């Protein structure tokens, strides 16, 4: 059984971020960002996270799953103030769910991460209300409810 968590790194210092990962005994961090090197926090860059997790968070493993990130086009649309999706987040959620069903390899999530007890989904948003990791978590629970339980937002 996978305990699934969510975390965003913005508004957290490196000390806070890695402290949370360590305190919650996270075995594997799954990065679900489209651009894992384009963020403001240097500690969250793709090439640095595996080292920091290994050294500062009890050997936590790192895996980038770009197929679970919203596409560039979908992100552009939700950020464009003139698009309906930017005003109604449910439209984004529906489009992202469709993307996960048709263009991702979501079906192998349990197979790939089932060897870990505590897994966290990472993206940049500080909370998950308007973040794709919440939608992804919900979908994983719907698809794999016997193999995954939601542990919470970190």
Q: Residue locations for each model-derived region?
A:
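Residues lining hydrophobic/aromatic ligand-binding pockets adjacent to catalytic sites
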Residues: 1-154
């Amino acid at each position: 059984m996978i305990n699934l968590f969510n975390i965003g790194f913005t508004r957290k210092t490196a000390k806070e971020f890695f402290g949370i990962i360590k305190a919650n005994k996270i075995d594997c961090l799954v990065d679900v960002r489209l651009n894992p090197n384009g963020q403001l926090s240097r500690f969250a860059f793709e090439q640095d996270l595996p080292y920091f997790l290994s050294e500062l968070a009890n050997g936590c493993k790192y895996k980038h799953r770009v197929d679970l990130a919203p596409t560039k086009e979908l992100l552009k649309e939700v950020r464009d103030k003139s698009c309906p999706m930017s005003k109604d987040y449910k439209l984004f959620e529906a489009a992202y769910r469709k993307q996960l069903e048709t263009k991702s390899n979501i079906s192998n999530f349990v197979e790939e991460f089932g060897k870990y007890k505590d897994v966290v989904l990472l993206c940049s948003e500080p909370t998950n209300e308007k973040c794709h990791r919440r939608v992804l978590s919900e979908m994983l629970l719907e698809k794999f409810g016997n193999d995954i339980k939601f542990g919470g937002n970190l």
